[in-house]
Amino acid sequence: MLHLHILSWVLAIILFIATYLNISKNQGGTPYFKPLHMVLRLFMLLMLISGFWILIQSFMNGGANHMLLTLKMLCGVAVVGLMEVSIAKRKRHEQSHTMFWITIALIIITMVLGVILPLGPLSKLFGIG
C-alpha cells in the first residue's frame, strides 16, 4: 500500500502542475485541461484512500509516532484542498500564484514528514522504524 501511496503522490504532483499550467489567463482552459483535472482528482482520491489505510495500519501496530502521523494526514488533506482551490482560482482568472506557491510549500512539508515517519526511507536507513 505504501508504494501505491507514493506513486499516487508523485503522479498527483505532476498532474497538478500540468493542470495548473494548462489554464491560459486570457482564454481559460486548453482542450487538455478537463481530462488532466479529472485524472488529477482520481489520483488525489487514491492518495487519500491509501494514506488513510496506512494511517490505520500504523495506529494498529502501535509502534508509530501518532502525533506526526496525524500531522501528516492533516497536511495531506490540506494539500488536496489547496490543489483544488488554486486550480479553481486560476480557472476563474483570479490571482492564484500565491496559492500555488503555498501549495508547493505544503507539498514539500508533507513529503518531509513522510520521509521521517517510521515507514519512511530515513527510518529504514537508520533502523529506527
Curated annotation (Swiss-Prot):
The keyword Transmembrane applies. Pfam families: DUF1516 (PF07457). InterPro entries: UPF0344. GO terms for cellular component: plasma membrane. Keywords: Cell membrane, Membrane, Transmembrane, Transmembrane helix. Its main location: membrane. It is a multi-pass membrane protein. It is found in: Cell membrane. The chain crosses the membrane at residues 1-21, 36-56, 67-87, 99-119. Belongs to the UPF0344 family. NCBIfam families: PRK13673.1-2, PRK13673.1-6. This is UPF0344 protein SAB0838. It comes from Staphylococcus aureus (strain bovine RF122 / ET3-1).
